[in-house]
Amino acid sequence: MAVPARKTSKTRKRNRRGHIKLTVPGLAPCPQCGELRKSHMVCPSCGYYDGKQVVENN
């Protein structure tokens, strides 16, 4: 089996993992109530999507 000839330094390890990170979800304000919601999803607070009420919220 192959074995590394030298210890991988912290810098090389971090450079290799530089692209592995969390992404921020795309949030947009709801045009009806102004609350933040995910883009292209029904607003969880008011139940509107594309100017129409889709879900009943009590």
UniProtKB/Swiss-Prot annotation:
GO terms for biological process: translation. This is Large ribosomal subunit protein bL32. InterPro entries: Ribosomal_bL32, Ribosomal_bL32_bact, Ribosomal_zn-bd. GO terms for molecular function: structural constituent of ribosome. GO terms for cellular component: large ribosomal subunit. It comes from Limosilactobacillus fermentum (strain NBRC 3956 / LMG 18251). Belongs to the bacterial ribosomal protein bL32 family. Keywords: Ribonucleoprotein, Ribosomal protein. It holds the Pfam family Ribosomal_L32p. SUPFAM superfamilies: Zn-binding ribosomal proteins.
